[in-house]
Amino acid sequence: GTNGARVCGGSAQAVFDRTRCYIREEHHVFTTMFDLYALPNDFPGYSEANCIEDRYDRVVSFEKAFFKAVGSERFIPYIQLHEYEALVFCGLDYLLQMYKGCEKSIEKLKLDLSKVDNPELINDNPATAPSKRIIKAIEGEKKTRYNYDKPKAGKFVAQKVGMETLRSQCPHFNKWVEKLMAACDRGCV
């Protein structure tokens, strides 16, 4: 996953300490990309945000609490709703270039996607999260097909799909990109 908390020792405090350290050392904008799923329960605003029903409002609440905890105007927090693999749903057909013979499974993923407004809303359940759905589609029920390579496939699909498609299909992702572009326009990079 893209959760720095797992990389930084499993606690939000380790993430904040590292983030503050980077911000002190640099004079540029600093950002993050963490998955909403599996945020540590010591993440700022955790209890409050998890009581918010609307998923977009919930993730924004987390980002605001993260921004406040870091305490720098040069920090642009981003938490992916629900996980990075939601962006892969913008280009499901590209998975077929890596994983031949999965056409029926990819069609099932497209059907899942058609039931929601956009890829960011594909799921709100860790058991059937975007990555879990993709893994099941690629590896099969009994894992007799491919071994799904999340980093490689995610990078491949994102490059093939392109930034404009990701932005047009994923509103929360787009708002993050707009904030980064505004920072560039202000000369803060």
Language-model features: locations:
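Ligand-binding grooves and catalytic loops that recognize ribose/phosphate and carbohydrate rings
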Residues: 8-17
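A short beta-strand-loop structural module common to alpha/beta enzyme folds
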Residues: 1-9
